[in-house]
């Protein structure tokens, strides 16, 4: 194996597509501006859309046709309307077109976009920036890289090739 010289970077201040073509995630720099517990997700850029409902509890029911999930799977949910928190969740109570996740207590509903192929998740609970090098050739993202940043003051720089 020879050295790869064509490593590039992408900087994100909000959730979104960082790379829109096949790439390998090589490393990540996460820079929080405040000490708060959060999870940042890097996903293969393939999504499914649907709806969600949180009826005044901590149970969020997500409806996405033929989602293909199993109990215990981790998914990144981008709630595109309503007030639910965008982040990675563990799936439960799976049926063909629905599943549930546990959220902060709320009464809200709306639209959601799901990324079911999480390449890497990073947790942090202080205001210190940190870098993570992905070993070997990196993690393959066949359809590009979507970055899921929580609703806090944080930026990411990812390195890919």
Annotated model-derived regions:
Residues 26, 36-40, 71-75, 154-156:
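Short beta-strand/loop motifs in extracellular/secreted proteins, especially
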Residues 63, 130-138:
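Exposed aromatic-hydrophobic patches
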Residues 35-47, 116-122, 156-161:
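Short, surface-exposed beta-strand/strand-loop-strand elements in extracellular ectodomains
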Residues 93-95, 123-130:
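Short proline/glycine- and polar residue-rich coil/turn motifs
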Residues 27-31, 65:
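Short edge beta-strand/loop segments characteristic of extracellular beta-sandwich folds
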Residues 46-117:
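Small/polar beta-strand repeat architecture
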Residues 1-23, 33, 149-161:
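C-terminal interaction-tip segments
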Residues 26-28, 138-152:
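Noncatalytic modules at the cell exterior or secretory-pathway interfaces
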């Amino acid at each position: 194996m020879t050295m790869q010289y064509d490593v590039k970077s992408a900087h994100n201040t909000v959730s979104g597509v960082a790379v829109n073509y096949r790439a390998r995630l090589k490393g990540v720099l996460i820079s929080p501006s405040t000490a708060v517990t959060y999870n940042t997700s890097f996903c293969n850029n393939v999504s499914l859309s649907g709806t969600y409902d949180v009826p005044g509890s901590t149970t969020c029911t997500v409806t996405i046709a033929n989602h293909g999930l199993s109990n215990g799977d981790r998914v990144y949910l981008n709630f595109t309307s309503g007030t639910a928190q965008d982040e990675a969740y563990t799936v439960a109570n799976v049926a063909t077109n629905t599943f549930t996740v546990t959220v902060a207590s709320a009464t809200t509903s709306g639209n959601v976009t799901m990324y079911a192929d999480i390449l890497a998740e990073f947790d942090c609970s202080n205001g210190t920036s940190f870098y993570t090098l992905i070993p070997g050739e990196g993690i393959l993202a066949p359809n590009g890289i979507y970055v899921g940043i929580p609703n806090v003051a944080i930026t990411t720089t990812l390195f890919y090739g």
